[in-house]
């Protein structure tokens, strides 16, 4: 039996959100997830995670200065290694993440019950957050290209 909230989120994202397939009602989705092998507790946590992400769409944007520096707290340091923290800050520096979307990404990462989160998981959380935020289509497309484009090799 699968026991990871992130796996439930990935299943939903790949089968419904990312493929533009219309999901059924919540009860039918829960039944499908049970049939796919997910536990009731993980399904509930995944829906809570998605509800919190959806609720964040209505929060007003807070002004942020370009010269501000983000210091990570203990819970973030415990779950994110140097590479993942650097990647998040890099995306903010190049304009893919705003200060608001960065904070939402960090909030959603901490909401996963995983002890330590790897770079691939962080990339998927970023993609899910950008997908959910109105006006972030360009950033979403950039992030999607970063994740899925395979570089071509030149042959001489």
Curated annotation (Swiss-Prot):
Write down the InterPro entries for this protein, in alphabetical order.
Answer: Smg
In terms of domain of life, where is this protein from?
Answer: Bacteria
Q: Which PANTHER family match?
A: PROTEIN SMG
* Family that this chain belongs to: Belongs to the Smg family.
Name this polypeptide is given: Protein Smg homolog
Q: Which organism is it from?
A: Halorhodospira halophila (strain DSM 244 / SL1)
